[in-house]
Swiss-Prot record:
PROSITE patterns: CARRIER (PS50075). The gene is dltC. Belongs to the DltC family. 4'-phosphopantetheine is transferred from CoA to a specific serine of apo-DCP. The lineage of its organism: Bacteria, Bacillati, Bacillota, Bacilli, Bacillales. This is D-alanyl carrier protein. It comes from Staphylococcus aureus (strain Mu3 / ATCC 700698).
């Protein structure tokens, strides 16, 4: 499975919503797809399943606003 697909699957799992895979440009926070509690869960899952550590200090809601932006940010960190 390619990295992008792994990230989108993980995001869909945390969000409990496949819209993140169907529309990777959806504004996940603005649309209420992911809340702050799920954000913490997402960061933990990224660390556990992708072995990429993202501290809450490195997390910027604007830079992580869409699934596509999350994939890009994680590609830079891996």
């Amino acid at each position: 499975m390619e990295f992008r697909e792994q990230v989108l699957n993980l995001l869909a799992e945390v969000a409990e919503n496949d819209i993140v895979k169907e529309n990777p440009d959806v504004e996940i926070f603005e649309e209420g797809i992911i809340d702050s509690f799920q954000t913490v869960g997402l960061l933990l899952e990224i660390q556990n399943k992708l072995d990429i550590e993202v501290s809450i200090m490195d997390f910027d809601r604007d830079e992580w606003a869409t699934p596509n932006k999350i994939v890009e940010a994680l590609e830079e960190l891996r």
